[in-house]
């Protein structure tokens, strides 16, 4: 721990391992745990796929098949074009699993990652990538780029320009107003997507840290109360991390369906 006071403890647990200064500041811990989460997802699915059989499937194969069918159903309900359905389906599955694994890191006791890092001479370490706005905003920017891509793919460059200049008021005189309204709506999608995930995961991480502070109290009462509170919040947080992964995936699919489906607008 970086200090001896409660404020020092909280500050230490909420400080990233960084390199660089200013705009070029990079959160190394966020990058590391994001990559580890992605590798775990790929390794797990590769192992299941390589051992898949046409006979009686194992428990993990059943789990993966159910997950794939569920995500495929979500995509089919939203994407009308079969030519991109598999692409967006693969993206949706990746988003859900990747975000879920990154969220699930929050269930590791808050003192374990920093204390292990201290053994390696690393003074600061935050293990939950989705509690970092730079990570969630980075994913949302990728979704934003895909929204632009699929809008142009579906409607053409001319249709893309018309969509953001002649809607909702179909007259050339309202082009500036239309563009402003549509630009705000378009930019709000990735921003809200990023801050929704970040806000929920940051709050969850902070609550775990505050509960851990109770174990440091001199009085026995908060120390005892910290145990059931920790357990209750951890159980509830399982729902939160799953729900947030689903919401991020679902909104991505919905945004891309609006961008691609010609019937919209």
UniProtKB/Swiss-Prot annotation:
Sorted alphabetically, which keywords does the UniProt record give? ATP synthesis, Cell inner membrane, Cell membrane, CF(0), Hydrogen ion transport, Ion transport, Membrane, Transmembrane, Transmembrane helix, Transport
Which superkingdom does the taxonomy of this entry point to? Answer: Bacteria
Establish whether keyword Magnesium is in the entry: no
Of the GO CC terms on this record, one is: proton-transporting ATP synthase complex
A biological process from GO = proton motive force-driven plasma membrane ATP synthesis
| InterPro entries, alphabetized | ATP_syn_F0_a_bact/chloroplast, ATP_synth_F0_asu, ATP_synth_F0_asu_AS, F0_ATP_A_sf
Membrane topology type: Multi-pass membrane protein
Q: Which residue ranges does UniProt annotate as crossing the membrane?
A: 26-46, 88-108, 132-152, 168-188, 195-217, 231-251
PROSITE patterns from the xrefs? ATPASE_A
Molecular function GO labels: proton-transporting ATP synthase activity, rotational mechanism
Localization, per the record, is: Cell inner membrane
Q: Any idea what job this protein has?
A: Key component of the proton channel; it plays a direct role in the translocation of protons across the membrane.
Subunit details: F-type ATPases have 2 components, CF(1) - the catalytic core - and CF(0) - the membrane proton channel. CF(1) has five subunits: alpha(3), beta(3), gamma(1), delta(1), epsilon(1). CF(0) has three main subunits: a(1), b(2) and c(9-12). The alpha and beta chains form an alternating ring which encloses part of the gamma chain. CF(1) is attached to CF(0) by a central stalk formed by the gamma and epsilon chains, while a peripheral stalk is formed by the delta and b chains.
Listed PANTHER family: ATP SYNTHASE SUBUNIT A, CHLOROPLASTIC (PTHR42823:SF3)
- Similarity field: Belongs to the ATPase A chain family.
Instruction: Return the HAMAP family for the record.
Output: ATP_synth_a_bact
Q: What is this protein called?
A: ATP synthase subunit a
What is the species of this protein? Histophilus somni (strain 2336) (Haemophilus somnus)
């Amino acid at each position: 721990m970086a200090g001896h006071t409660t404020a020092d403890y909280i500050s230490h647990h909420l400080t990233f391992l960084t390199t660089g200064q200013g705009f070029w500041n990079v959160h190394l811990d966020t990058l590391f745990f994001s990559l580890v989460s992605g590798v775990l997802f790929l390794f797990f699915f590769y192992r299941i796929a390589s051992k898949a059989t046409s006979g009686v499937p194992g428990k993990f194969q059943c789990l993966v098949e159910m997950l794939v069918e569920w995500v495929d159903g979500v995509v089919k309900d939203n994407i009308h074009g079969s030519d991109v359905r598999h692409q967006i389906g693969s993206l949706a599955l990746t988003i859900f699993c990747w975000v879920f694994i990154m969220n699930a890191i929050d269930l590791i006791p808050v003192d374990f990652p920093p204390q292990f890092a201290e053994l390696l001479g690393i003074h600061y370490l935050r293990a939950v990538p989705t509690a970092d706005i730079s990570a969630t905003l980075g994913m949302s920017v990728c979704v934003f780029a895909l929204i632009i891509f699929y809008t142009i793919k579906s409607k053409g460059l001319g249709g893309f320009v018309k969509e953001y200049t002649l809607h909702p008021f179909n007259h050339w005189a309202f082009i500036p107003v239309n563009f402003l309204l549509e630009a705000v709506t378009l930019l709000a999608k990735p921003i809200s997507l990023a801050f929704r995930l970040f806000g929920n995961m940051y709050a969850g991480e902070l609550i775990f840290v505050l509960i851990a502070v109770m174990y440091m109290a001199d009085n026995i009462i908060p120390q005892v109360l910290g145990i059931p509170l920790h357990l209750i919040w951890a159980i509830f947080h399982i729902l939160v991390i799953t729900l947030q992964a689903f919401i991020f995936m679902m909104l991505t699919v919905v945004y891309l369906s609006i961008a691609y489906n010609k019937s919209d607008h």
